[in-house]
């Protein structure tokens, strides 16, 4: 690939830049920047649409997952992302069911060529709650059945079948623990997490068919100086076995990382979010950018 530089005497000097270097520069850009670069020229559009580049971009993106913040104000949403700390102690996929009523469910499969909603049936009428999670193609979420009995629903996006985990031990936050469904429970009646909490429990679903759970208890380090009495919400667990919590305290937004192996707490301030302190905020882990999805829109 060639580029031209204008010298002081007004002449131009064409430079040959290795394509590998160009690709490496593009790989460091965000999806939004890649979209703009595709509009620069046909050559750039061709280069950035090649399978080699899109696969390599996804591989790099998987190695550096991000935190995704979604702000809701009225009917409007604003999405922001921030690098997800991979080692905080050193400072440093898609179908989704949408419940319409007790009996009907709609799904939309991205990338299938047929961008339309389809209706599927479920054998047990239920009403879904917030806080679902997707693990290896299985979507888990809480739901109410019969007289508002609480169950965990498992929807397989491949077979489009529903399964039910009846008699869930506790109504805790659904998180991904080493590829297994887990329930996070702080040691309080009100399921709050703050600086005075001394331990947390994790129930791990070891066998979905037999509905067998294992219990894990973690004794927390002294952390009142870091968290005070601020109530936090559990976002989930990273692939490096770190619980992630978030909280808005006054004008500031904080993310806390608890490493269960090192038994340490790390507090990170997310700057630039002061304008959204009065908005409803949703935080998601392991956000990965994929430039291949831009080809469908």
Swiss-Prot record:
Residues 11-60 form the F-box domain. Pfam families: F-box (PF00646), FBA_3 (PF08268). SMART domains: FBOX. It comes from the Eukaryota. PANTHER family: BNAA05G37150D PROTEIN-RELATED, E3 UBIQUITIN-PROTEIN LIGASE SGIP1. This is Putative F-box protein At2g19630. It comes from Arabidopsis thaliana.
